[in-house]
Amino acid sequence: VERDEAGRLIREIKPLEGIRKTIAERMTFSKHEYPQGTGQVLLNVDKVMQFRKELLEKKGIKVSFGDLYVKAAACAVEENMALNASRQKEKLIYYDDINLSVMATINGFLMEPVVEHADQKDIEEISAELKKTYENLRKGKLMKVKLEGGTFAVSNLGSALIDSQQPFISPPEGAIMGISRNRRVPVFDENDNVVPANMTSFALTIDHGLCDGTEVVNFFASLNKILQDPWKYMYHKRGQAEEA
């Protein structure tokens, strides 16, 4: 029987090593070296749910809400490229590639697989890529997964009983979007009638050494616009002409 200095009974002692040590070091560095600010917003996702249902019914394609929000993030970042950046020493680096680091807990560890050029992929491509990525991570095939090179991060806790979150940025990325669970709640419509709506809380944490609150406001405005018209944005690819 072993107790600590305060007399508490110790069940087990493990060394801080491997992936757990790497995560601890990265998050400690993030907290102490980057002045962070977080904004939160509650957005209506009824249209997203309808789009997901129609995609399954009409094309037989099942995508997760996480997939949809990753694509939405790519579109929102495309409209707010000041967030697609990194602060490294005395330099502010702005990227043209939009590579999304998607936080995921795999086999008990926090991983950050990267969806490269997410702005140039539609929802079907992103969903298929993430499914394959998660499968490789669960099987321990790390060499087949891109785990670095992200320019913007996404943390999805939508499947957990979490109403809101305040994610830490994951350097060198200068911003991270957090997604919490969907809740069906009563809201007022344009005629002041109480109606049910699916609402989801989104957060955006930024490096204040890189950008300011204005970018957070603009990002949420873009995100809301995208979520209200998923039929347009889920198949949007940067650099390609939109269909009439």
Please tell me what each predicted stretch does.
Residues 1-244:
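C-terminal catalytic/motor cores of large multi-domain enzyme assemblies
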